[in-house]
Amino acid sequence: MLDIQLLRKDLDGVAKRLADRGYTLDVAAFAALEAERRETQTRTEEMQARRNSLSKQIGAMKGKGEDTSAVMAEVGGIGDEMKASAAKLDDIQKRLSELLQGVPNLPHESVPMGKDETGNVEVRRWGTPRQFDFEVKDHVDVGTPLGLDFETGAKLSGARFTMLRGQIARLHRALAQFMIDTHTQQHGYTEVYTPYIVNPEILYGTGQLPKFADDMFRVEKGGDENTVTQYLISTSEISLTNTVRDSILEADALPIKLTAHSPCFRSEAGSYGRDTRGLIRQHQFDKVEMVQIVAPETSYAALEEMVGHAETILQKLELPYRVITLCTGDMGFSAAKTYDLEVWVPAQNTYREISSCSNTESFQARRMQARYRNAQGKPELVHTLNGSGLAVGRTLVAVLENFQNADGSVTVPAALRPYLGGIERLEVAAG
């Protein structure tokens, strides 16, 4: 959530920056609510001052033995008015909060201007795409003989669900384990196992609600317990980041670096007809997530570090990729700045997103009330960052396609072989 003081000080300036990312702020609605708030607050303060004055007058009158009934009646009337005014002020504050909860973060000054993904800027590339001397297959054709089972996944759960069997299941597990080990052993993250079901207020904290409710899977408890709507996580960023909600951390507790391997559940609303073949866009997929909770002055250095951590995974797997900076019109709701890592997908002859690393600055922290004690000992909002390290299913896609062989086998990247008992190739079973 944006700091409301920013809007109060420079409403037109904030509206301009939001317009840069394709969001139209309802300036008139905010200005009207603010005017109503100021008027109500001023009236409340005037009544408070009048009541205080009358209370002193009552004391003086009693000291003189004078009749105070009329003045006390006026004080009582003011009290009733103040209660009504306070209720009105609470309602205005609630409406202001609801308005702000739908407003995205402000883009950092270094973010390139652009309306959509065509405005994204490439930062660097690593690796050279392999030149094949045979006809390249996509991951569906490579993976199906090795245990990729879309038919059973669809039979069990419908479209965009997949079952992995045998060698493919082992490779998928090896990828996740390799990522977690790298982040915990080399990058200083603490591994966390998180709940996959969270309460609505947790999603408000990280910005999925209220704006993106249609992208989530909702669940309800069975039995006789009071029914409360909860949600399946769309990323473990949600649960990891909210570990510091309603907290005041000591400065020496920062940075906090957390990582988790979890399934992610997304309804993919609005994605009809996109990436219908294969593993690229699924309702359920695994991801290894990185989250950092840091002091504000270090957050952009932390963002660069986090991107480097995601790059390390791709480099160890020998997968060609590129890093791009998302433009103002292509960033996610909570982000102030985002880098995407895109891996080379040979069958599509293009790069596809495999990681997104974002600095949300204080946007999520304000919604969660996550603070730390700064150098002056005063509570200040932390900055929160999140990044994929990596999307496991899409990494599986990249391995299958980049390491495929003419005979249908897949060479196992050297970094993964210790997780697969030293196996160097996934072979298609005879017959």
From Swiss-Prot:
Catalytic reaction annotation: tRNA(Ser) + L-serine + ATP = L-seryl-tRNA(Ser) + AMP + diphosphate + H(+); tRNA(Sec) + L-serine + ATP = L-seryl-tRNA(Sec) + AMP + diphosphate + H(+)
EC number from the UniProt entry: 6.1.1.11
Recorded GO CC terms: cytoplasm
Keyword Cytoplasm: yes
Binding site for L-serine: 235-237, 289, 388
Keyword Translocase appears in the UniProt entry: no
Location of this chain's protein in the cell: Cytoplasm
Gene3D superfamilies tied to this protein: Bira Bifunctional Protein, Domain 2 (3.30.930.10), Serine-tRNA synthetase, tRNA binding domain (1.10.287.40)
Pathway the protein contributes to: Aminoacyl-tRNA biosynthesis; selenocysteinyl-tRNA(Sec) biosynthesis; L-seryl-tRNA(Sec) from L-serine and tRNA(Sec): step 1/1
EC supergroup of this enzyme: ligase
Ligand binding (ATP): 266-268, 353-356
Domain notes: Consists of two distinct domains, a catalytic core and a N-terminal extension that is involved in tRNA binding.
Function field: Catalyzes the attachment of serine to tRNA(Ser). Is also able to aminoacylate tRNA(Sec) with serine, to form the misacylated tRNA L-seryl-tRNA(Sec), which will be further converted into selenocysteinyl-tRNA(Sec).
Protein name in UniProt: Serine--tRNA ligase
Gene name tied to this protein: serS
